[in-house]
């Protein structure tokens, strides 16, 4: 009996109609059967948010040989939970988020709905990868990333990933990629994050904006440096946020507390 093709579950935070997810599906189709469960509209910046105040529902968008596409009224994480719990008839071999319009390097990983997809897959014990491009334009050119996406996804299908570990892969916006660089997450922060917009009724409103400040400009081992220098940044990311290096010291402090 012929073995089943690998099942790859795909989602994003830019919405089911975004070019990035369409291109991702195109790149992944040679590797297996693709099921898309993506938000019905953009959900950028939603992180691992869940919908808990009202029901969500999903709808079939397209079905053809090797590809099924659904849209969902929930968040990216809702999409993965719903697909795994109520839609798919078998466990995916791989979960892929993206391709995000805009990078998810450095601290952006904490805010990203695309990485929320990946983190949820990781928590479910499924190898998971997030792909992002440093270009926010709706018509961004994803073509240079295609061969890298196929090879990285095929590698993880074959090799797997350690428990509670996923991959955060970011592409610089250039047709001349220099290759891949395995990186650590850059340390930095966003500054000047809000623009105040006055209104005639004296009630100001605010647009989220800002710029990223890298605190380690000379660190050639972080993802921000790799992207600035034309490399595909691959960052192994863990969902275990325990500060193991501080446990013993904190335990010492706590032993001195009196209750």
Curated annotation (Swiss-Prot):
GO molecular function: 3'-nucleotidase activity; 5'-nucleotidase activity; exopolyphosphatase activity; metal ion binding; nucleotide binding
Residue positions binding a divalent metal cation: 13-14, 44, 100
Annotated keywords: Cytoplasm, Hydrolase, Metal-binding, Nucleotide-binding
Co-factor binding details: Binds 1 divalent metal cation per subunit.
Subcellular location(s) of the protein: Cytoplasm
Record SUPFAM superfamilies: SurE-like
Catalysed reaction equations from the record: a ribonucleoside 5'-phosphate + H2O = a ribonucleoside + phosphate
Enzyme Commission number, as recorded: 3.1.3.5
A single cellular component GO annotation: cytoplasm
Role this protein plays: Nucleotidase that shows phosphatase activity on nucleoside 5'-monophosphates.
Official protein name in the record: 5'-nucleotidase SurE
Native source organism of the sequence: Bacteroides thetaiotaomicron (strain ATCC 29148 / DSM 2079 / JCM 5827 / CCUG 10774 / NCTC 10582 / VPI-5482 / E50)
Gene symbol of the encoding locus: surE
